[in-house]
Design a protein with these regions (language model features):
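Phosphate/NTP-binding elements of NTP-utilizing enzymes
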Residues: 1-167
């Protein structure tokens, strides 16, 4: 039996328009700004998971400037979203390597620190392509050129791409 989740209970009313735009497919990037308690990270994690489910050949990369901050921030945020969307039985979350795998398809959400952006050049997935990214704490990155270089390393093919940037 499948349960129905009310997204209105998970996403702040101030972000409903963002969700509607993502759902309609009219945007390929969202930028979420706000302070603590703004629920921007909750929105980002939910949208990333929902998009992953809609694109079975696509994988995702979740990025922070400093790798040691991944586990206590975006990894835990994705774990929360998996649970909130009642998907816990369908995902395997591991910390070494740090990733979330959607068991029915093998799609991966990888968590990457950009302490050394050169490491991204050799990133591979077992099938399909990396088509989604989420830059958390965007203001910690060096600027648009660094973000563009990362996206060029990640988005190397595939028919779909989507970027989430939050700060």
């Amino acid at each position: 039996m499948t349960s129905r989740i009310k997204l209105s209970g998970l996403i702040s009313p101030g972000l409903y328009d963002v969700h509607r735009a993502v759902r309609s497919g009219t945007v390929d990037e969202i930028v979420l700004a706000g302070g603590r308690g703004s629920t921007k990270s909750s929105c980002a994690s939910i949208e990333l998971l929902l998009l992953l489910l809609q694109h079975p050949d696509c994988h995702a990369a979740v990025l922070r400037k400093v790798g040691r901050t991944l586990r206590t921030s975006v990894y835990e945020q994705i774990a929360w979203a998996v649970s909130a969307l009642d998907l816990s039985s369908r995902f395997e979350l591991t910390v070494s390597p740090m990733r979330a795998v959607y068991k029915p398809t093998g799609q991966r959400i990888m968590f990457l620190g950009l302490d050394d952006p050169g490491k991204l050049k050799s990133i591979k997935v077992p099938f399909g392509y990396i088509g989604m990214d989420w830059f958390e704490e965007l203001d910690q990155f060096s600027g648009p050129e660094e973000v563009r270089n990362v996206e060029q390393s990640l988005f190397r093919g595939g028919s779909f791409s989507f970027s989430i940037k939050s700060f």
